[in-house]
Amino acid sequence: MVTTHNLGFPRIGAKRELKFGLERYWKGESSRGALKALGAELRQRHWNDQRDLDLAPVGDFAFYDQVLDMSFTLGNLPKRVQGFHGDALDNYFRVARGRSAQSAEEHAACCGGVSAGEMTKWFDTNYHYIVPEFHADTNFSLDPSRLLQQLAEAQAQGVAAKPVIVGPVTYLWLGKAKDDSDRLALLPKLLPVYGALLDTLTAQGVEWVQIDEPILVTELDAAWQQAFRTAYAALETRRIKVLLATYFGQLQGNLALATSLPVDGLHVDAINARDEVDALARELPAERVLSVGAINGRNIWKTDLNATLDWLEPLAKRLGDRLWLAPSCSLLHVPVDLASEEKLDAEIRSWLAFALQKLDELKVLATALNEGRDKVADALAANAAAIHSRRHSPRVNNPAVKAAIARIDAQLGNRVSPYTQRAPKQSARLNLPAFPTTTIGSFPQTGEIRQARSQFKAGTLDEAGYRKAMQAEIERSVREQESLELDVLVHGEAERNDMVEYFGEQLDGYAFSQFGWVQSYGSRCVKPPILFGDISRPKAMTVEWITYAQSLTNKPMKGMLTGPVTILNWSFVRDDQPRSVSCYQLALAIREEVLDLEKAGVRVIQIDEAALREGLPLRRAQWGEYLKWAVESFRITANGVQDDTQIHTHMCYSEFNDIIASIADMDADVITIETSRSDMELLDAFDNFKYPNEIGPGVYDIHSPNIPTQEHIVGLMKKAAERIPAERLWVNPDCGLKTRQWAEVIPALTNMVAAAKTLRNQVQ
């Protein structure tokens, strides 16, 4: 009999209950007890949703991030929070976001907030984790209380529980040594704590534990490969059964290593590594389980169940009870329930599967393998009809778009002149001071903004009323920026619910869900649009709002667009053509918007490519092809303008050292980047690479409510000036200010502008 299980479930709730509960607690509007009760309620609901599985995950729920949870389980707290006392949950939030609830901070042993932990992308997804911090003298100590609490809840509910933990080698790999020490040198101190954790789970009656080691799908050198052998040899003596889980890619050169480790089962991502399944079935020792991730845990399209059974059936015959079935990875990366989508186009809806529907697909596959296809004939027939409908729908294919793609040539991505000739023309047109100040684009999304948007979508506010409300918010943003004496202004993006969804709503080839939310980090959720067909732009998308904002001021007003690579990487993308083709389609559509903004007199146009890096394949050998079409797509979008129009781009959570040449090849006049959480460490990339254009290293962390001081900003910019000529430096926050409050934004930007004025006097 085939065993079914799941690697992880979305934690936010079908209607984002966790998001709202967290934000109430942080604002002091609810108690710690209420937040913990909400967590327990969500866990109970999610285990009930997974009741048909043979094994359900436990420990996949986190109030902020599963890697941060693991840091607390291992007793690895940053030194800066160790002086705080009180409830561990408040310390947890201090590490995650710099502070906990206001009431907790008022009674803390130390005063004020602390620096939030560094946050970065989880492999090549749009989820973010809090980076573990290490020093040469880091010690570990077991605190299993969070995991044991969840395990007790699951067992009381009758759940066949499979605890999920981040593996020891991946945990070290995900972290950063703050003193440049060797992370692997900590492995001998870490392994006894993992051993004690496994013993603790055994004592609670746990039969199987899932240990996630996704770095096995990356390129590992000999030292990291040896770390796996050392780690699992040390853990082998434990009585608990270990399912080693990999996902997001192929094992390739690590396949022999993975099959040789002394564990009881191995999970592989059969969506990305389908070609490796047969080799794994051959090479895995005869007593071990092979868990096959046959359902895509990262995208929302229905699985072709009949085609999947065609290759699973011979595997099941070969492996028998040793075959387990699961999604390819945790379902954290997809929305919860398609049944909530009452307004989604019926035809498109029939092509989709969210988390609960993926579990249904899993059940159909298992039943077909265990009892024969006849037992699920109706489900298989319905699935086949949906697959056929999508494949042959005229809504998916647009001949005019395909013809435009065929006409793309190299000249389409070239500016009229090189940067050295463009820069003087832009300087003359814009007349900016040294260290010009700007923001990244968005200002706080107030309750009034959200209410107006909600009323407009519900039909209780007409278009004229909505436009008036948005114009009032835009004017407020402009007046605040003028009062702050910022140099290049933005309109604030009041009309935009999301930097990707906003554009997707106005492009043909996209569809939109009501409740298709996925977690990005903490309480931050995104609702990726659904790219189902060929992309085109029926009409201008932003020109009306930007030109209105420009009419309110004589200062330069940035046009704000999201770039094609980011729209692609932050969408649920069709899987029936190469991603590069979809990206080129987006590039042509956004290019039309860039040219319309220029015609309307907009002097500065920002094209955000926040997600450029996250699209990189996990293996460096595959980077070249991705970067080629990603950079080409940006250049097609941006480079139709005249020399005196200044093109900005923004990237966040990115490390640049290894792709700096490709970023330079994008040829944006100004690039703004996230650097404050890493203390300008990202600028190390410029030590050995002379970046030719202008750059704005982010000077304060907008993901934390803490207010940066003028002195801190000056210090960061002086560090930047050691690597970048001062005349090519801009002063700006790390990212957009959408998630902050005006009461936080005004003092932060006041200090930022004051710092820029100080720099103009101090730095030559």
Swiss-Prot record:
L-methionine binds at I440, G441, S442, E493, D608. InterPro entries: Cbl-indep_Met_Synth_N, Cobalamin-indep_Met_synthase, Met_Synth_C/arc, UROD/MetE-like_sf. GO terms for molecular function: 5-methyltetrahydropteroyltriglutamate-homocysteine S-methyltransferase activity; zinc ion binding. Zn(2+) binds at H650, C652, E674, C735. It catalyses: 5-methyltetrahydropteroyltri-L-glutamate + L-homocysteine = tetrahydropteroyltri-L-glutamate + L-methionine. Pathway: Amino-acid biosynthesis; L-methionine biosynthesis via de novo pathway; L-methionine from L-homocysteine (MetE route): step 1/1. The active site is at H703 (proton donor). L-homocysteine binds at I440, G441, S442, E493, D608. 5-methyltetrahydropteroyltri-L-glutamate binds at R16, E17, L18, K19, K121, R524, C525, W570, E614. Binds 1 zinc ion per subunit. Keywords: Amino-acid biosynthesis, Metal-binding, Methionine biosynthesis, Methyltransferase, Repeat, Transferase, Zinc. Catalyzes the transfer of a methyl group from 5-methyltetrahydrofolate to homocysteine resulting in methionine formation. This is 5-methyltetrahydropteroyltriglutamate--homocysteine methyltransferase.
